[in-house]
């Protein structure tokens, strides 16, 4: 009797337990139905199309080591932007829609630029892309900031190939420069048999209908000058002509039976920004803004003979691009993994030729996809917005893509288990940025908030008369409000001590004259007022140089000695343009005992607690004046 009562109780408990879960499941389904779909408002590509076979190419570029999302706190509102967990979810949604018809390709600059990449020696990125099923990548400009040994290690760890047809090893006399997993191009096979298109063709009793579609991908690395390569071990490496290598490889792929050829290149293009941020489905007939005809990728595409390539996944310029240059579709995204785009290639069976052909008029681009935990309901994005304007964008809501909720994907759980504890301490708040609602971005003009904060701290820590820094070393932006520790570490990812040395006024003038017309212009300074003029050939040059304390200008005495500060990477290792300066100048009174520049910036800002950026830049009295 006792056992039967236990059984009845057990059955009742199970029934109650099951019933209690039913409303939750129903509520969840209802909740998902109510989510906004960021892809609503245009016609999607139909995976079950009976006329065309679509292959979806997901393109990423310039992720710069950002595995974790960027945390934003605007007034009372907290949200995030980016994060590979959410990018992974998009890709898996597509894979469910287009089984075995998704190609995930990365166009370079994968490692340099984040705290987590530094902490893991870049391994967090390779491990993540391995788990996400990346199909191929190429080398970006900042891949060469690392040693060749580092790059070869990353290539060997990758479960995907690195593609680059224009890198040549002069010593080994081969294009396969960085190991067995680096190849110049690759063919990808897609099974057509599980589609309505193929089944309909078979029902028509057509003979010898191909059951696969083969496309090729040619990789091109950014062409680098010797002076631009910061890593060691590349003395034997040279870069071959873009057009020649692409044409040769594309022809070989076509001869091998590839129906379409896609270029994967860390080469940049900039297109007008007016219509670039709204998620949409773009076609060759879509209205689009202009693209800069002087950019490398534009010129390369324009130089090609017809039929060489059918699409491009680009990078380097950190721009949202979903444009056609004549009849070639190009996708590229902003940096840090905040966006991605999809290139849909359609294929149709040509009965008379008994082959599949790509139909360029039906190519579509979907993007830019916002990589977000939540989106603003009105903009369907999660970018930084000003505190005074945030109410115009609210609320922040969960969302779906192609009918499926975008949420943190569990594909990368093992990465979190391995690295979260190591990274968590970098979420500590260091200070609060005030005085502006604008993002503090890196600029090339040599006089901007972020750069001026760095050079000001150099001067305060060393007491130098003049401080110099390279904008090329700064790798991220800061937003107003609370500044976490990882933002400081993302800004300067290299470990390098702050140094002082002695120079005469004449030597400072010679150095600045070279730096401000070198490869990495314009250098950031504290303690100097510069006038930059243009010569008859249209080239800028340093025409005047004075000492400057932020208010008053005084003459730089040519024979007098001054204390100068910069980082060890520049003055001791000859980084960037300093290699040529060290050809004629030997540092005197060199002292590099001040500590790491990143540690010093963190220490100073933490002590300040509140940092008003308005004191770091005077619009009416700039440190650099340009005269045409």
Predicted feature locations:
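Acidic, metal/ion-coordinating pockets
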Residues: 25-368, 373, 445, 449-457, ...
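Compositionally biased, low-hydrophobicity segments enriched in charged and small polar residues
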Residues: 15, 115, 128, 473-478
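Catalytic centers of hydrolytic enzymes
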Residues: 29-96, 196, 200, 228-243, ...
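Short amphipathic alpha-helical segments that mediate assembly, nucleic-acid/protein binding
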Residues: 5-8, 297, 412, 578
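Bacterial Sec-dependent signal peptides at the C-terminal "C-region" and cleavage site
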Residues: 17-24
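Cleavable N-terminal signal peptides of Sec/SRP-targeted secreted and luminal proteins
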Residues: 4-17
């Amino acid at each position: 009797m006792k056992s039967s009562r236990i059984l009845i109780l057990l059955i009742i408990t199970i029934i109650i337990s099951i019933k209690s879960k039913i409303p939750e499941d129903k509520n969840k389904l209802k909740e998902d139905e109510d989510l906004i779909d960021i892809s609503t408002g245009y016609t999607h590509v139909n995976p079950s199309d009976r006329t065309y076979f679509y292959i979806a190419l997901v393109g990423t570029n310039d992720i710069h080591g950002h595995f974790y999302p960027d945390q934003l706190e605007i007034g009372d509102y907290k949200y995030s932007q980016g994060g590979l967990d959410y990018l992974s979810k998009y890709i898996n949604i597509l894979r469910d829609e287009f089984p075995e018809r998704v190609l995930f390709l990365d166009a370079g600059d994968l490692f340099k630029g984040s705290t987590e990449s530094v902490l893991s020696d870049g391994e967090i990125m390779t491990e993540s892309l391995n788990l996400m099923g990346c199909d191929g990548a190429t080398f970006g400009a900042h891949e060469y900031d690392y040693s060749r040994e580092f790059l070869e290690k990353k290539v060997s760890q990758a479960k995907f190939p690195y593609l680059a047809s224009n890198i040549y090893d002069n010593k080994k006399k081969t294009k396969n420069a960085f190991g067995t997993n680096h190849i110049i191009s690759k063919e990808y096979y897609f099974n057509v048999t599980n589609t309505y298109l193929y089944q309909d063709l078979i029902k028509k009793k057509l003979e010898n209908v191909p059951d696969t579609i083969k496309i090729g991908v040619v990789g091109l690395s950014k062409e680098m000058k010797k002076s631009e390569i910061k890593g060691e071990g590349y003395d034997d490496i040279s870069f071959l002509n873009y057009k020649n290598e692409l044409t040769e490889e594309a022809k070989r792929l076509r001869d091998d039976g590839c129906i379409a050829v896609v270029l994967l290149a860390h080469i940049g293009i900039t297109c007008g920004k007016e219509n670039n941020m709204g998620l949409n489905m773009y076609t060759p007939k879509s209205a689009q803004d202009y693209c800069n005809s002087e950019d490398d990728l534009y010129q390369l595409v324009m130089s090609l003979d017809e039929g060489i390539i059918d699409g491009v996944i680009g990078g380097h310029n950190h721009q949202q691009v979903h444009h056609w240059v004549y009849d070639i579709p190009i996708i590229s995204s902003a940096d840090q993994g905040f966006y991605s785009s999809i290139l849909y290639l359609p294929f149709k069976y040509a009965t008379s030729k008994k082959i599949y052909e790509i139909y360029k008029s039906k190519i579509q681009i979907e993007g830019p996809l916002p990589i977000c935990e939540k989106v603003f309901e009105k903009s369907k994005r999660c970018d930084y917005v000003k505190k005074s304007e945030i109410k115009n964008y609210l609320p922040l809501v969960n969302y779906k893509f192609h009918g499926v909720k975008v949420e943190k994907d569990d594909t990368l759980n093992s990465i979190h288990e391995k690295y979260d504890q190591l990274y968590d301490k970098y979420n500590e708040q260091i200070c609060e940025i005030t005085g502006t609602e604008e993002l503090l971005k890196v600029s090339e003009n040599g006089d901007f908030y972020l750069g001026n904060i760095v050079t000001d701290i150099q001067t305060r820590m060393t007491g130098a008369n003049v401080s110099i820094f390279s904008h090329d070393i700064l790798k991220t932006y800061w937003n107003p409000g609370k500044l976490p520790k990882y933002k400081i570490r993302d800004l300067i990812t290299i470990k390098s001590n702050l140094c002082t040395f002695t120079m005469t006024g004449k030597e400072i003038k010679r150095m600045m004259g070279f730096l401000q017309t070198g490869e990495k212009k314009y250098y950031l300074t504290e303690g100097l007022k510069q006038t930059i003029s243009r010569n008859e050939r249209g080239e800028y040059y340093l025409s005047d140089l004075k000492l400057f304390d932020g208010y008053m200008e005084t003459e730089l005495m040519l024979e007098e000695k001054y204390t100068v500060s910069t980082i060890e990477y520049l003055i001791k290792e000859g980084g960037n343009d300093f290699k040529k300066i060290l050809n004629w100048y030997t540092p005197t009174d060199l002292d590099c005992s001040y500590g790491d520049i990143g540690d010093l910036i963190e220490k100073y800002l933490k002590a300040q607690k509140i940092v008003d950026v308005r004191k770091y830049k005077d619009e009416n009295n700039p440190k650099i004046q340009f005269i045409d």
